[in-house]
Amino acid sequence: MKMKKQCATLTFFIGLHGYTIAEDNPKNISLSVITVPGHHERQPDRSIITQNEIDQKQSDNVADLVNTVPGVSMAGGFRPSGQTLNIRGMGDTEDIRVQVDGATKNFEKYQQGSLFIEPELLRRVSIDKGNHYPQYGNGGFAGTIKLETKNAKDFLQENQLLGGLLKYGYNTNNNQRTFSGAIFMQNDQKNIDALVYATVRRAHDYKRADKTPIKYSANNQANFLAKVNWWLTPSQLLAFSKVHGNHNGWEPFAAKRDLLPGPTEAEITKYGLDLAWKRKLVAREQQDRSYSLQYQFLPENNPWINTVAQLSHSSTYQHDTRSEQASKTYLASLGNESWTRYTDLTFDVNNTSLFNVAKTSHTLLVGLQWVKHKRQTLIFDPSKLQKAEYNHGYFQPSYMPSGHQYTHAFYAQDKIKIHNLTVSIGARYDYVKNIGKPNIATIYNDPTAGHDYSSKHYPGWSSYLGLNYKLTPYLNLFSNISNTWRAPVIDEQYETQYAKATLSPTASSLDLKKERITQLRVGKQIHFDHILSNNDQLSFNSTFFYYKGKDEIFKTRGVRCFESAQNNNNEVCSKKIGNYRNLPGYQIKGFELEANYDSTYWFTNLSYSHTIGKRLASPRNPWLASTSWIAEIPPRKAVVTLGSHIPDTNLTLGWKSEFVRRQDRSPTDQDKDAGHWALPKSSGYALHGIFATWQPKQIKHLRIQFTVDNLLNRSYRPYLSELAAGTGRNIKLSISKQF
């Protein structure tokens, strides 16, 4: 422990720094064609995955794509739609903001994934860790992940008006075949360009290292992208993006889990093997949609005006149907048929002004934002067909209510530059309104049990302060501190149980307070050019972070009231206790180190991340006079990449190793009864892989990608997957030809 404290202290003082609110350059447009492919912005605490890195990884899903970024981990299993993300120990959907071409994505369903975008459609991924941006409010404590899809300009050659792309990929582990095609074009004036891109994946079950299949992990999905950029004038851009994704197949209801409760011998004899298994599964139909329309006005000679307005809409829909031969006792897992749809409608308009006052230069950002989030849920439970209080089987699940959340916001930030020092001061005001939708089943719409679907309002300010000091041309020091908050999501506010429930409280949770967090980060960035040759670069980044949360919104289970804290006798508590409550708080801290070297002939990358976190009480007992480990804290991780460029043959080769420590900290270490809130402790492991990219000079625009994951075929069980087995060796090959 002493050594850990020394490491954290050393990281703190190595970069006694300044803080910038690392925001997007106001001159950049998330959909614009003017963004340079592969450009690494030197923003504090921002990780960038470029087009080349996306192509080299050949990932099936976004969570796998970002899994080796320092401080970022994949959670969940390896089935389609079974992945979520974790950033610095925070993994709830409301903690991680995801945007696709500026369109906010939200999906939260028990034991389901939350990211469904196809990596093949992406050109760039940026990850901003922490919540240090006044453009974003009401949650997103862990950070923001921006997914930018491909542009026509990524493919068009100089003076080319029309072109196409064909691509084929194959994975050996699950016999996956990927087919992609694109058409891209621009007009003679080069002020309008358009792209249509489609990709299809067909795969069998994944296999573990011991060759056993991960049953019902087959992939069957199709994705489509359409994109248009239109420069109305040299200073006005109109950009449109449309992303569609479809997936269907038989799979477990809990897509994040690994092992399935298989059929018994008696069931196999009665139904046959195929039907006996499908009685345990759901036939899932999934649709994911994102639309974004953006307008930018940037007069060439007017530094006071750089206006961006964006309207976006996103939706995720899942329709699950169980076999007609399935049991009729699936109330706790969305019945025998369910319909779930999450939609987000967002409008944002902002302006950036550049001006000078005395000897200081200012970059002033002012914006307005409006968000409508809607959750629609419905299930069919055939066991309740004859019960009027359950609306004859059709109703909203009590643990996944329907409702709306509206957000109205104003934000502003001024970046003041004085010589080599930049001071960033920002503020944001959010007015959040939750509106529950009364359950159509009267058993879950009972005022005597505390069921209340009335609206709840949460107004409040967030503040941001940053310093950034360029000590030398090679050394940049930064520091940020922010105080932000979030309102309860619909599930947290309006989850209920029927009046006679004994294992859980019955009431909705209209007395919840806002969850607040103070986030601090300090670090340094070092960058050198021309170290060993004229074309090499060396960079080193270090960041220390500390988060202090207050009034954490958490499900009410275990000890329900102060009177029962000593003897666990909840009978003495009020009958109208909310299903969620505010816990005292938590602390998360850690550090990340990253070094990169790139030259004409070879390159390397080293990264290390370490996070620890504790709640100020037990998750089941807010009155326990002891801290407890946070279960979602990932184990320590180091990633090493070493490779070589061979310019004469346009060949790049590399080796990547990932070293993950065991995770042996659990809430049960302090509270033996907190097992429901714990993840199984895990062993450490090391994974190795190789990759190669070849663009033969003899065949123009031909590109061959070769990747091997888990080269040594190591058996492993990632901690955040709840010990779901990892996949065995996977050899990936893709060939693309541009015309």
From Swiss-Prot:
UniProt key word Membrane: yes
First and last residue of the signal peptide: 1-22
PROSITE patterns, A to Z: TONB_DEPENDENT_REC_3 (PS52016)
Keywords assigned: Cell outer membrane, Membrane, Receptor, Signal, TonB box, Transmembrane, Transmembrane beta strand, Transport
Stored InterPro entries: Plug_dom, Plug_dom_sf, TonB-dep_rcpt-like, TonB-dep_rcpt_b-brl, TonB_haem/Hb_rcpt, TonB_Hb/transfer/lactofer_rcpt, TonB_rcpt_b-brl_sf
Primary subcellular site in the record, as a coarse category: membrane
Membrane topology: Multi-pass membrane protein
Residues in TBDR beta-barrel domain copies: 161-739
GO biological process: siderophore-dependent iron import into cell
Location of the TBDR plug domain: 38-150
GO cellular component: cell outer membrane
Gene Ontology molecular function, alphabetical: heme transmembrane transporter activity
Induction note: Expressed only under condition of low heme concentration.
Localization per Swiss-Prot or TrEMBL: Cell outer membrane
Family recorded in the similarity comment: Belongs to the TonB-dependent receptor family.
PANTHER family xrefs: FE(3+) DICITRATE TRANSPORT PROTEIN FECA (PTHR30442:SF0), IRON III DICITRATE TRANSPORT PROTEIN FECA (PTHR30442)
Annotated function: Heme receptor.
Protein name (database record): TonB-dependent heme receptor A
Organism from which the protein derives: Haemophilus ducreyi (strain 35000HP / ATCC 700724)
Gene: tdhA
